[in-house]
Amino acid sequence: MAGCRELELTNGSNGGLEFNPMKEYMILSDAQQIAVAVLCTLMGLLSALENVAVLYLILSSQRLRRKPSYLFIGSLAGADFLASVIFACNFVIFHVFHGVDSRNIFLLKIGSVTMTFTASVGSLLLTAVDRYLCLCYPPTYKALVTRGRALVALGVMWVLSALISYLPLMGWTCCPSPCSELFPLIPNDYLLGWLLFIAILFSGIIYTYGYVLWKAHQHVASLAEHQDRQVPGIARMRLDVRLAKTLGLVMAVLLICWFPALALMGHSLVTTLSDKVKEAFAFCSMLCLVNSMINPIIYALRSGEIRSAAQHCLTGWKKYLQGLGSEGKEEAPKSSVTETEAEVKTTTGPGSRTPGCSNC
């Protein structure tokens, strides 16, 4: 409760406009602050660029936009992009520059970080369910998972993520409830509720992926039986196996990147944390940013359709740049006065058109 009294004194001094989220949360040394600034900046920029590239490839391809699977992947890329920008900026401002915000602005920032990471996990769950339906009900998959239903599922997931994440901004804060030792103004009971919600999402992902990977194993066995003869639908089976392995890799990366931070959050609910543990949590939190950075790499390396879209996009840009180069050569200055005078006589004759009009 001492933290609550400190908050009340701080907020009451200037109506909350000079709210400083407790110095006890700003525990990094100068060397650690430099490391956080460098790592967050580099990983945040790289992750943002990667996810923007994935979003652009999906949105610019009419074929990919029509497929529910890539709508879910696009949602994941969008959530990871927002997480990269919002988390990296706010993390550096808080731990490195010790930024001062009003109470509501601070809760808005931490709620935005929570929403983006929650939506990322939610998008991964929807992607897993999509693969589950594709492998378990292939004849009726297209009827079950339509583009409209995919958009509705994504809308519900994003709204639910936002609602849960912004509960502290809507009034669910600490004081008189016990404050979290890891997050200013966040009560332990809210943190417990959010951890339970994330645990449900992870349980769904693990169960779904386990079943998907088991089905993929069956498909591999089926491929081995028919490897010496052509079988209708064999290419589709190989696609499903490849996607299942990709999603299994994503799940493994997700658990490796998230488990340390989630474990320390749960540990903070039952015991008092030392500064060393809080410092460890600060760096473990950046593993979530690593997850956002790795996801698009996995898709780019393992999704043939996204690679094809990237090659098509690069070919288009190459032709465009070559066209600009050829236009520059055509507009090079004349080599002699006689050549220039001859062109002037030609363009000023009856019925002549200027170069600008000829392009219209």
From Swiss-Prot:
Homology family: Belongs to the G-protein coupled receptor 1 family.
Residues bearing PTM Phosphothreonine: T338
UniProt entry tagged with the keyword Transmembrane helix: yes
Region named Disordered: 327-360
Pfam families: 7tm_1
InterPro entries recorded: Canbinoid_rcpt_2, Cnbnoid_rcpt, GPCR_Rhodpsn, GPCR_Rhodpsn_7TM
Residue ranges with Polar residues bias: 349-360
Single GO biological process annotation from the record: inflammatory response
Glycosylation sites: N11
Free-text tissue specificity from the UniProt record: Expressed in spleen and brain by neurons and glial cells (at protein level). Expressed in lung, testis and thymus but not in heart, liver or kidney. Expressed in cerebellum, cortex and brainstem.
Function: Heterotrimeric G protein-coupled receptor for endocannabinoid 2-arachidonoylglycerol mediating inhibition of adenylate cyclase. May function in inflammatory response, nociceptive transmission and bone homeostasis.
PROSITE patterns, per the entry: G_PROTEIN_RECEP_F1_1 (PS00237), G_PROTEIN_RECEP_F1_2 (PS50262)
Entry superkingdom: Eukaryota
Positions of transmembrane segments: 34-59, 72-92, 105-129, 150-172, 189-214, 247-267, 280-301
Cytoplasmic side: 60-71, 130-149, 215-246, 302-360
Keyword Glycoprotein: yes
GO terms assigned for molecular function: cannabinoid receptor activity; G protein-coupled receptor activity
Membrane topology summary: Multi-pass membrane protein
Keyword list, A-Z: Cell membrane, Cell projection, G-protein coupled receptor, Glycoprotein, Inflammatory response, Membrane, Phosphoprotein, Receptor, Transducer, Transmembrane, Transmembrane helix
Positions carrying Phosphoserine: S335, S336, S352
Protein name as annotated: Cannabinoid receptor 2
Topological domain spans for side Extracellular: 1-33, 93-104, 173-188, 268-279
Post-translational modification: Constitutively phosphorylated on Ser-352; phosphorylation increases cell internalization and desensitizes the receptor.
Localisation per UniProt entry: Cell membrane; Cell projection, Dendrite; Perikaryon
